[in-house]
Structures are given as structure tokens and as C-alpha cells.
Design a protein with these regions (language model features):
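Transmembrane beta-barrel outer-membrane domains
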Residues: 53-55, 80-86, 112-116, 137, ...
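Cleavable N-terminal export/targeting peptides
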Residues: 1-57
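Surface-exposed loop and membrane-interface regions of Gram-negative outer-membrane beta-barrel proteins
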Residues: 100-124, 129-147
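Transmembrane beta-strand segments of Gram-negative outer membrane beta-barrel proteins
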Residues: 51-68, 102, 123, 265-267
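Surface-exposed strand-loop-strand hairpins of Gram-negative outer-membrane beta-barrel proteins
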Residues: 68-89
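Outer-membrane beta-barrel transmembrane domain signature
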Residues: 82, 99, 164-263, 270-275, ...
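Short strand-coil-strand connectors
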Residues: 54, 96-100, 124-126, 162-164, ...
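Hydrophobic, lipid-facing positions within transmembrane beta-strands of outer-membrane proteins
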Residues: 58, 87-93, 100, 117-119, ...
Length: 288
């Protein structure tokens, strides 16, 4: 038997009121949750920011370098220069759409006859960057070799990843090159897939400049870019065997800006353990 004093049945009007209050509370709680915005509710700023992600962009400029260094090697030696100082003019033009870009880059050295023209196709997303590029250089030919002469081209793919805007890992492998072959014991040739990897760390020093330390090496025999040294000469017909460290660098850099124009300046030191060569490199540029 249930006593009436133990059970409370609200009057209809109170029950209806409490029910309406409960539904109102649920409605308020629901609207406070994170839900996808209605497209009609987007502000003009939101639309502009979304459009900026996939829009056309460009950059143009040039560097002036006291020498053209690549993977720890002085490229002027390939062009016949022996002064170890060969001022180089290096223009660049980049056209991009969103995270994809096409870049044209060139080098013309003052004292030697080394000239180069590179074409890049790249993708960059946050810390990841992937490129495929073609290098055209008429070494010793005063850049007169026909552009479609396959003996003057090589095709390379690279992948970079930067952690915390400080630590950068880089890997490059050449897939096509007329001289990138290793002769096997039976006299036949196989493609070497010459490669290069690099670890770089950048440390800002207050607002003064950035300090970058680089260590780079070839993981295995790289016929087309990693030669042996004989006296003061490089023997490109006899590549260095196996793993070799080729690039130990320390660079101080700073970028000055004025409106949309930037003026990067860097001073670096490079030591190549394989060739036992030391280099000082001064570079300045102009970009807009």
C-alpha cells in the first residue's frame, strides 16, 4: 500500500511549465555546441581567407653569391675555374597556385664558363616539400649545347620535412642522368640512382640573425656528382665509393624587408671532408 504522502503528482499547469523550461535548456545547450556553419552565415573575411588558400601567387628575384656551392662542391671547378672565388648571378622566378608551384632558376658564373638552368615542379604543405626538377648545364660548352640534348640534362626528385621550423631533413635522388651508371663486375652497367641526404638545424639569435648548421653526405656511390680528388683536380670518371660526407656548413643569415621587398644576406663557411676543401661564401639577394 502506497501512502499518498509519499507520491507527489504535480498539477497539470506546473508539469507543462517545467517541461517547456527543460526543452528550452536543451535548445540552448545544443546551439552552443560546435557545428558546421551555414554557408550563408560566413563573413566576408572567412570567404577571403578560404580563397587565399587556393589562389595564384608569384615571387621573383636574384642572388649574388661569391661562389656557386652545391652539396659541398664548388661548381666553378666543373666549369674550369681554379680561383675558388667565382661571383655568380642566380635569378629565380616562382609561379604558384595554392600549395603547388613551378620555379625557374639559373646560374651564370663570372670567371668560369659554368652556367645552369633548372626547372622545378613542387608541392609544399606545412613542413613537407616535394619537388621534381630538371637540371640543364652545358659544362665546358659555354651553354651552347642544344636544350633537348639529353647528355646535358638530369632529373632529380627531392623530399624535405621541417620539424618545429628548426630541424630540416632533406633527401634527393637522381633518376635520369647520362653519366649516372656503375660498371658491374661482369662489365655491364646499372643505374646508380645517385643520392644525397642532409640534416640542417636553424637557431635564431634574438632578432639579429639565424644560425644554420648543415651536415650532408652521399649514402652510396654517386657517379655524376661525387668525384674523387687527385691533387688539385677532380676525377669525374672515378666517383668516390660508398658513403661519403661532403658538406659541413655553418651559415649566419638575416633577411631585411621593406614593404613587399626582401633583401636576404648570408655569410657561410663550408668544409668538404671528401675533397678536403674549405670555402667561405657571401651571398646577398633581392626578392619581391
Amino acid at each position: 500500500m502506497v501512502h499518498a504522502s509519499c507520491v507527489y503528482v504535480p498539477a497539470p499547469q506546473y508539469f507543462l511549465a517545467s517541461t517547456m523550461i527543460a526543452f528550452q535548456a536543451m535548445a540552448v545547450e545544443t546551439t552552443s555546441c560546435d557545428v558546421a556553419p551555414n554557408p550563408t552565415d560566413l563573413t566576408e573575411t572567412d570567404v577571403v581567407e578560404e580563397d587565399d588558400v587556393w589562389s595564384f601567387w608569384w615571387e621573383a628575384g636574384f642572388d649574388l653569391a661569391s661562389n656557386y656551392m652545391w652539396r659541398g662542391f664548388d661548381q666553378s671547378y666543373r666549369g674550369g675555374n681554379r680561383t675558388m672565388v667565382d661571383p655568380s648571378f642566380q635569378p629565380a622566378l616562382t609561379l604558384g597556385y595554392g600549395e603547388f608551384y613551378v620555379r625557374l632558376w639559373g646560374n651564370a658564373s663570372l670567371f668560369s664558363d659554368y652556367k645552369e638552368f633548372d626547372m622545378f615542379l613542387g608541392f609544399q604543405h606545412e613542413g613537407l616539400e616535394i619537388t621534381i626538377y630538371d637540371v640543364f648545364c652545358g659544362v665546358g660548352q659555354d651553354f651552347n649545347a642544344p636544350f633537348f640534348d639529353k647528355s646535358s640534362h638530369n632529373l632529380t626528385a627531392t623530399i624535405d620535412y621541417t620539424f618545429f621550423d628548426r630541424l630540416r631533413l632533406h633527401w634527393a635522388t637522381t633518376f635520369l642522368h647520362p653519366n649516372d651508371f656503375i660498371v658491374k663486375a661482369d662489365g655491364t652497367e646499372r643505374r646508380a640512382f645517385s643520392s644525397y641526404f642532409e640534416i640542417a638545424y636553424t637557431q635564431p639569435v634574438k632578432d639579429w640573425f639565424d644560425v644554420e648548421v648543415i651536415a650532408g653526405a652521399t649514402p652510396w656511390t654517386g657517379p655524376f656528382w661525387c668525384p674523387t680528388r687527385v691533387g688539385n683536380e677532380f676525377d669525374w670518371d672515378n666517383p668516390a665509393k660508398g658513403f661519403n660526407v661532403t658538406n659541413l656548413s655553418l651559415t649566419l643569415s638575416r633577411e631585411f624587408t621593406k614593404g613587399n621587398v626582401s633583401f636576404p644576406v648570408s655569410l657561410g663557411y663550408t668544409y668538404n671532408p671528401l675533397s678536403n676543401q674549405h670555402y667561405a661564401l657571401l651571398t646577398t639577394g633581392f626578392y619581391f
